[in-house]
Amino acid sequence: MTAPAEVEVRGVLDRLTDAWNSGDAAAYGRLFTEDADYVTFFGANFPGREAIESSHRALFEGPLRGSKLTGSLGGAAKVRFVRPDVAVAVVGGGSSLTGAEVADEGRESTVSFVLAREGGEWLITAFQNTRVSDPRG
């Protein structure tokens, strides 16, 4: 795949980080397709842009107020193109509830994204967040 498309995909992930770090649920939601699926680390599914935005508004105004995603999602992601208009990105990252630059213990995740090019722009159509844990318990 061409480098410009990969740069655009990485840019979406960086804008996602910026929206989270700003607590901007509307900007966060705009990065998803209307029919996106958003699966949280605990298995809940928020289907559709509206549900993704409203759930994040509640989080950003409540328990995740002031939280930060650590690192650069776009910079760290492994990106591959399934077709010219569909990309998969996988990235390790984490979050800090105190706004620190390093993830809080137990808040490291591996996140998988499927992005689709719609109307000339890349949007996230599927999101899966999985907490990193020791398989030995």
Summary of predicted features, one role per range:
Residues 11-12, 71-74, 110:
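Short, conserved clusters of charged catalytic residues that mark active-site
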Residues 25-87, 91-92, 105-106:
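A solvent-exposed, acidic/Ser-Thr-rich amphipathic alpha-helical stretch
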Residues 1-34, 123, 135-136:
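Short, low-complexity N-terminal intrinsically disordered segments enriched in polar/charged residues
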